[in-house]
């Protein structure tokens, strides 16, 4: 698999005045997000939505942006979207006036091989000072650690693949740190592996 073409595009996400932030994380919509995805995403009241690639029809991003601002990258099927970056660095900052990053996330479509980070993704995360890697591609919801980095795959809210659940993720930023979770797109309930 070739390395991502764009070394880095960076964006800032300011925290709320109380030092918190809620991110919804989706991936692999393949033009067909689950019919209840928007309802369950909106119920989580995210400050922003991250899309980890394989968007398909870019109208998906327009619909998601009705819920919250969207930060998206291109996946391997998104050849029609050259305006989207392959990699996005997201700096979580206190405010627009205080742009020093408190935490840095790296958003990349193909980030892992099984439960392990791909070597080039781990090197990129380290080079850019990221503490966590958010990825998609496999449709497998996953939270783990490798090489000192947190790895989070939200799963897929697109068409069901094999026996995999249809889920999205949330990242809650609090003064105590990050809290990751998965949400069942069909029921809106928290999802945990069987």
Segments predicted by a language model, with ranges:
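Core catalytic region of metal-dependent phosphoesterases/phosphodiesterases
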Residues: 2-99
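Active-site-proximal segments of metal-dependent phosphoesterases and phosphodiesterases across multiple
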Residues: 78-129, 159-162
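Short C-terminal domain-edge/linker segments immediately following a structured domain
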Residues: 54-59, 80-83, 107-111, 135-141, ...
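Conserved beta-sheet core of the metallophosphoesterase superfamily
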Residues: 71, 113-177
């Amino acid at each position: 698999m070739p390395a991502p073409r764009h070394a880095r595009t960076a964006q800032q996400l300011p925290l709320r005045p109380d030092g918190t932030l809620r991110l919804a994380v989706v991936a692999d919509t393949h033009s067909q997000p689950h019919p209840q995805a928007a309802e369950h995403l909106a119920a989580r009241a995210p400050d922003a939505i991250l899309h980890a690639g394989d968007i398909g029809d870019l109208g998906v991003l327009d619909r998601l942006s009705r819920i919250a601002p969207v930060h998206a990258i291109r996946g391997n099927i998104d050849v029609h979207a050259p305006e989207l970056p392959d990699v996005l660095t997201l700096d979580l900052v206190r405010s627009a006036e205080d742009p020093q990053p408190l935490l840095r996330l790296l958003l990349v479509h193909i980030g892992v091989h099984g439960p392990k980070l791909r070597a080039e993704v781990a090197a990129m995360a380290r080079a850019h000072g990221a503490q966590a890697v958010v990825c998609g591609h496999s449709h497998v919801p996953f939270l783990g650690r490798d090489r000192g980095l947190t790895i989070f795959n939200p799963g897929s809210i697109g068409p069901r693949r094999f026996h995999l659940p249809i889920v999205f993720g949330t990242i809650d930023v609090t003064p105590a740190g990050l809290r990751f979770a998965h949400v069942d797109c069909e029921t809106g309930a928290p999802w945990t592996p069987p």
